[in-house]
């Protein structure tokens, strides 16, 4: 069984906890209770393979950035969530993505962009096209979800697992190439008996 450390990041109030609870327990939590930190574990099957997902739901508030940064350092894949009904949450994504790369000290990480609350289309402030364009700029997958209506909830987590798998395979491939190129070429020695 493969283990994955997945982290939800995004501004406060966008529905990170609701997505997580809907995925873990198949229920929708209506009231907003700001998260400091929560962790969950779920065993599931993705593309025919058994997976154990450790899911870390982080605080959106800047007051808890040290806790969030710790999860960023240890996480393998990131579900970055904004609300389609709140333009400011969308505007914060690029900064959050850059901060994540800085904390991880990497050029790229497995990352899925999620526009949540698509059931509230009449209050939409961020178009689907804007989400798709940002995902293209960030070179990541994009889905619109609704924790309330259970739209694309599981698929967003599964897509992130797929991205982590790709990154692991890419790292294994590059590590094996580095080992091959870093090894000095050994000359064959012959033994002469006199």
From Swiss-Prot:
Membrane topology: Lipid-anchor
Post-translational modification Cysteine methyl ester, affected residues: 191
Gene Ontology MF, one: G protein activity
Enzyme's top EC category: hydrolase
InterPro entries: P-loop_NTPase, Small_GTP-bd, Small_GTPase, Small_GTPase_Ras-type
Location in the cell: Cell membrane
Key word GTP-binding present: yes
Residue numbers covered by motif Effector region: 32-40
Lipid attachment site numbers (S-geranylgeranyl cysteine): 191
Low complexity bias spans: 169-180
GO CC entries: plasma membrane
Enzyme nomenclature, EC number: 3.6.5.2
Keywords, ordered alphabetically: Cell membrane, GTP-binding, Hydrolase, Lipoprotein, Membrane, Methylation, Nucleotide-binding, Prenylation
Residues annotated as binding GTP: 10-17, 57-61, 116-119
Domain of life: Eukaryota
Propeptide residue range(s): 192-194
Pfam families cross-referenced by the UniProt entry: Ras (PF00071)
Function statement: Ras proteins bind GDP/GTP and possess intrinsic GTPase activity.
Family named by the database record: Belongs to the small GTPase superfamily. Ras family.
Name this polypeptide is given: Ras-like protein rasS
Record lineage: Eukaryota, Amoebozoa, Evosea, Eumycetozoa, Dictyostelia
